[in-house]
């Protein structure tokens, strides 16, 4: 994590207890949201190790990391993500990569809307229904990368991209010729929200 001087002491004094196998690293440079993976990329730049990152405000199922690792073994030269989009789905630009097969998105047709309505909104499927390539990875679903996928340019983040690490990371992968493979081996949706309830409990343990 990266801490600014004004709140560094407070944060350090309130770090949670973690297992002995876990290290909490505090970096000198604040790279925005990308701080959760770029320092690891730099530290292990000369090693052939996988770096897995995610968001801290989500709940991940026990098999989440194993799925990313399994997908990486089948696609060793790709970044692996469980959530992602093509550029045309999230921007005004009608462009997408040419690598096939593309990840297939769920069709929000009448059948989809009826099922959502009948479940009173509780049925929330993943937006992708089949594995394939995407233009933009989405870190909240979990991502596996290798340090060799990046150059020093990844650390020179412009102001306009400082808060959009998914876009910046995906762009760096594209520049370096690395494809993004979205894996959809299991129909498990990453959950959020519960963390707000669990955080106070963790602090009391």
What are these regions (language model features)?
Residues 2-49:
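Active-site-proximal specificity loops/subdomain of glycosyltransferases
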Residues 47-59:
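Short beta-strand-to-loop acidic/aromatic patch adjacent to the donor-nucleotide binding site
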Residues 47-49, 76, 178:
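Short coil/turn segments at beta-strand junctions that form active-site/ligand-binding loops
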Residues 56, 145, 165:
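A conserved hydrophobic position in a structured secondary element of the catalytic/binding core
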Residues 59-157:
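Conserved catalytic core of nucleotide-sugar-dependent glycosyltransferases
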Residues 156-205:
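C-terminal catalytic/acceptor-binding lobe
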């Amino acid at each position: 994590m990266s801490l600014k001087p004004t709140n560094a002491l407070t944060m350090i004094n309130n770090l949670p207890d973690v297992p002995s196998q876990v290290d909490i690293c505090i970096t000198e440079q604040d790279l925005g949201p990308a701080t959760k993976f770029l320092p690891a990329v730099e530290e292990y730049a000369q090693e052939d190790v996988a770096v897995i990152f995610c968001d801290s405000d989500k709940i991940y199922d026990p098999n989440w990391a194993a799925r990313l690792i399994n997908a990486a073994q089948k696609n060793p030269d790709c970044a692996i993500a469980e959530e992602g989009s093509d550029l045309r789905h999230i921007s005004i630009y009608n462009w997408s990569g040419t690598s096939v097969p593309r990840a297939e998105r769920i069709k929000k047709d009448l059948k989809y809307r009826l099922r959502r309505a009948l479940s009173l909104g509780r049925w929330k499927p993943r937006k992708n229904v089949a594995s394939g390539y995407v233009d933009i990875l989405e870190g909240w679903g979990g991502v596996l990368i290798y340090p060799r996928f990046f150059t020093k340019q990844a650390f020179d983040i412009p102001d306009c991209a400082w808060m959009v690490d998914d876009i910046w990371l995906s762009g760096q992968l594209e520049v370096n010729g690395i494809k993004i493979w979205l894996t959809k081996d299991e129909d498990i949706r990453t959950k959020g929200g519960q963390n707000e309830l669990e955080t106070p409990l963790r602090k009391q343990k």
